[in-house]
Amino acid sequence: MRYLTAGESHGPQLTAIIEGVPSNLPISIEEINEQLARRQKGHGRGRRMQIEKDQVKILSGVRHGYTTGAPITLVVENKDWTHWQGIMSAEPVEEGSEEKRRVSRPRPGHADLNGAIKYHQRDMRNILERSSARETTVRVAVGAVARQLLAQFGIRIGGQVLQINEIVAKRQEVSLDELIARTEESPVRCLDKEAEPLMMAAIDKAKEDGDSLGGTVEVIVEGVPIGLGSHVQWDRKLDGRLAQAIMSIQAFKGVEIGIGFEAAGLKGSQVHDEIVWNEETGYSRKTNRAGGLEGGMTTGMPVVVRGVMKPIPTLYKPLMSVDIDSREPFSASIERSDSCAVPAASVVAEAVVAWEIANAMCEKFPSDSLDDMEENVRQYRAYTEKF
């Protein structure tokens, strides 16, 4: 499978075209909209979330609730577009007009300056509109389609926030069902009820100070069969693809799988997961320090991926920058933004991980229809249990 997204933060809509989804997959628009609503929640979101009520429209590839095998077109309209029609118009406008609203002061930590230089743009709005994290809206919609495919095979996904700024949640061993239920009730998507109010207070203080906060999120995938991905070529390793997917999320600066960077300070005997076998489940591991991936392939254990999000670069008390017209120092430009988007980013992380796992399933079990894919998966799972 593959997909492309298009659209700007303040343009009329965000669009995704997905190709390669098997036919006869039941698609629920309500479930896609539920994921979009999850992305809009979270303590620390900005005023724009009071404007946007994201809802998906499916323009192709789904008929009467089922995929047809044709490309699927997803659209999410930007309600805020009504206030930006002149500024974001595709029609020419006069230089110096209000509609131009040119941006010449790049924000530290954003794509503004690098993109302007690369694409020969003197107006950095042409960069910031596309590089905005608003683009993740339609990626969550894409991920919601992937989740519905995975659900057909009993593969489930959950996520949580582990850290916001200096506040680190205490790790808790809970079932995926409990994790999903409890994080949905948390304004910061955190299991630790003691850390939750501290995180919220830190976000409020950052907002008061005109600053922003980052953090760490974790995604867990259960029910994944053994052998997704491959060891034979670098670009087919599933852990590499998952790392790229997480790092593709705006403002993410780090990723780890399983115990990740902790492994650097441990001995091999403390890192590797011992293999066990029984008649009911076949091969398994005593522990899951590898995070469900070894040699670029899934082990059958839960896939565990974490990502680090830096503080959002748009600050209401901006850092110093340089105006590209005068080359004089100025405070960087200000765009409406969140003070902390880590809870929302955990939903985005779930979406991009869902896509990669679903894509790996389609590669392992290539089928034009869901019916054929289900039979292929059934036979493979029976084979792995008897291996």
UniProtKB/Swiss-Prot annotation:
Reduced FMN (FMNH(2)). SUPFAM superfamilies: Chorismate synthase, AroC. It is an enzyme of class 4 (lyase). Its cofactor is FMNH2. InterPro entries: Chorismate_synth, Chorismate_synth_AroC_sf, Chorismate_synthase_CS. It comes from the Bacteria. Pathway: Metabolic intermediate biosynthesis; chorismate biosynthesis; chorismate from D-erythrose 4-phosphate and phosphoenolpyruvate: step 7/7. GO terms for biological process: amino acid biosynthetic process; aromatic amino acid family biosynthetic process; chorismate biosynthetic process. Its EC number is 4.2.3.5. FMN binds at R130, S131, S132, Q250, A251, G295, K310, P311, I312, P313, T314, R336. Homotetramer. This is Chorismate synthase. It comes from Brevibacillus brevis (strain 47 / JCM 6285 / NBRC 100599). The lineage of its organism: Bacteria, Bacillati, Bacillota, Bacilli, Bacillales.
